[in-house]
């Protein structure tokens, strides 16, 4: 079983990375229980047509009866199929006063034995120092430190950009959760959770306020198909054309620029002159009247210069380009072959 304390400053993405883990568990077919207000149909990997998610909403500050009501998270011995319990605003539960509160003791005992019930747990707190030391020792198997990369300024480049534009250099809104094995920042890093914000913002209530006077008990979310998917109507032709016009108007400049680049590239490719291929004209020679005028040996290669009956010099490289093969016999004797013809040429 894995227990995670997810920490980070306000707006650092604690809830977002936790919703990302909820999505991963739903896709894997696992059971979920949480005190977060979720919009399951907006989870990008779940969608409005999903029929199988099992997600329980528990009170903002659950009692022992609420935790007992969610039952088992996994009936098998495969811990990869464990359910996931996600609880936000846990700083008020695990401070020194609450940890020693006798009324909270049954809840703490349940957390300590959650492994036997097949639950993985994610606790969200702003800072680990809020949590009682005994609670950290007993439960903090993994601690996740959340960071937002768009709040970081790149050295030198970011400063130069700010001097030129007068504003902070925009960076991708990427949320990183660094998972440490243990409750110390010096503990070894076991993994990193990476999530982009845009596709998960609509999947939960980012302005949810937690209250001790939550008036609803444990209940199950309707599957996205029952709440949204079955009411979905396919777009007719007119609606599709209207959407097409909207998107064309929105991206018209980018589209025109792309078409311009593509047209220019196509035109330059078509009108580019093709390189001329030099044709080697094969000639016939009367090798009976050839003599070796000179020969040269370079390591394992040989080069000959021949003289025909008219005194014209022809080198062996030109003959080879015309398809003749030369076989070295000695510096004064060579065999010239092409097809079925084979001639011996010697020195004068």
From Swiss-Prot:
Q: Which UniProt keywords apply?
A: ATP-binding, Host membrane, Membrane, Nucleotide-binding, Transmembrane, Transmembrane helix, Viral extrusion, Viral release from host cell
List the GO molecular function terms: ATP binding
InterPro entries, per the entry: P-loop_NTPase, Zot_N
Give the GO terms filed under biological process for this record. viral extrusion
What is the topology of this protein in the membrane according to its UniProt annotation? Single-pass membrane protein
UniProt keyword Transcription present: no
TM spans, by residue? 254-270
Name a GO CC annotation attached to this entry: host cell membrane
Where does the record place it?
A: Host membrane
* Record-listed ATP binding positions: 8-15
Q: How does it assemble?
A: Interacts with G4P; this interaction results in a complex that spans the inner an outer host membranes.
Function comment: Isoform G1P plays an essential role in phage assembly. It is required to increase the number of adhesion zones between the inner and outer membranes of the host cell. The extrusion of neo-synthesized phages occurs at these adhesion sites. May be involved with G4P in creating zone through which the phage assembled and extruded.
UniProt record similarity statement: Belongs to the inovirus G1P protein family.
Protein name, as recorded:
Gene 1 protein
Origin species = Enterobacteria phage f1
User: What is the phylogenetic placement of the source species in the record?
Assistant: Viruses, Monodnaviria, Loebvirae, Hofneiviricota, Faserviricetes
């Amino acid at each position: 079983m894995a227990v995670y304390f997810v920490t980070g400053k306000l707006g650092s993405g604690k809830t977002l990375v936790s919703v990302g883990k909820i999505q991963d568990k739903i896709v894997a077919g696992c059971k979920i229980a949480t005190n977060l207000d979720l919009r399951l149909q907006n989870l990008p990997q779940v969608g409005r047509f999903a029929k199988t998610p099992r997600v329980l909403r528990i009170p903002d500050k659950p009692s022992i009866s609420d935790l007992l009501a969610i039952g088992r998270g996994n009936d098998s011995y495969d811990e990869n199929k464990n359910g996931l319990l996600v609880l936000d605003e846990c700083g008020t539960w695990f401070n020194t006063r609450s940890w020693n509160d006798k009324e909270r003791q049954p809840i703490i005992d349940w957390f300590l034995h959650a492994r036997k019930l097949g639950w993985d747990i994610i606790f969200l707190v702003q800072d680990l120092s809020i949590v009682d030391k005994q609670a950290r020792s007993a439960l903090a198997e993994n601690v996740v430190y959340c960071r937002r990369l768009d709040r970081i300024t790149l050295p030198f480049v970011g400063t130069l950009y700010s001097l030129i534009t007068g504003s902070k250099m925009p960076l991708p809104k990427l949320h990183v959760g660094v998972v440490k094995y243990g409750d110390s920042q010096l503990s070894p890093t076991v993994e990193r959770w990476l999530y982009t914000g845009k596709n998960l913002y609509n999947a939960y209530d980012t302005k949810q306020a937690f209250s001790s006077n939550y008036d609803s008990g444990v209940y199950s979310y309707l599957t996205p198909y029952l709440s949204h998917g079955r009411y979905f109507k396919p777009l007719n032709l007119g609606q599709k054309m209207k959407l097409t016009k909207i998107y064309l108007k929105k991206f018209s400049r980018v589209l025109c620029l792309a078409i311009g680049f593509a047209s220019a590239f196509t035109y330059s490719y078509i009108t580019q002159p093709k390189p001329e291929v030099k044709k080697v004209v094969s000639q016939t020679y009367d090798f009976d009247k050839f003599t070796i005028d000179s020969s040269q040996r370079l390591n394992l290669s040989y080069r000959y210069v021949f003289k025909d009956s008219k005194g014209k010099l022809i080198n062996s490289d030109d003959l080879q380009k015309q398809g003749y093969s030369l076989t070295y016999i000695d510096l004064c004797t060579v065999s010239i072959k092409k097809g079925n013809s084979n001639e011996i040429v010697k020195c004068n």
